[in-house]
Amino acid sequence: HIDHIGANRPLAEATGALIAIGTQDAPSLLDPTLNLTRALGRLAMGKASPGADILLVEGDKVYAGSICLEVLHTPGHTPGSISLLGEGIVFTGDTIFAQGGIGRTDFPGGSYDELIKSIEGKLLALPDETCVYPGHGPPSTIGRERMCLSR
């Protein structure tokens, strides 16, 4: 959504960074209804993202310098939502947040059932000490989120 893609164009132009996204979400980069720029109207003017350079699927590897992150397909917030798993860390985007928060599923393509499957089947299957870095808010751990989500 716009809160995660609004800087794609200037960042890519300034640095040569490639735009990577879960395969099923690639159309949303260019569709103002799916990425919510249309809903924001004037607030989103000039925030259009370029298309994807890299389409990611489960098991792909993404490198940031010497850091290797594995793609976990964690649909629910969007059909192509991904989390990135590294050694002792996971970047969860809008799938889970600290203190038991979970991603919204009321936007186009969202699915509560898929989100819960992603959380229970993939993220909560990780070791308790795995550090969680969500797309919004403070970091947490899988163990802490497992406790919060079980309430």
Description of each model-found segment:
Residues 1-62, 147-151:
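Active-site HxH/HxHxD metal-binding segment of metal-dependent hydrolases
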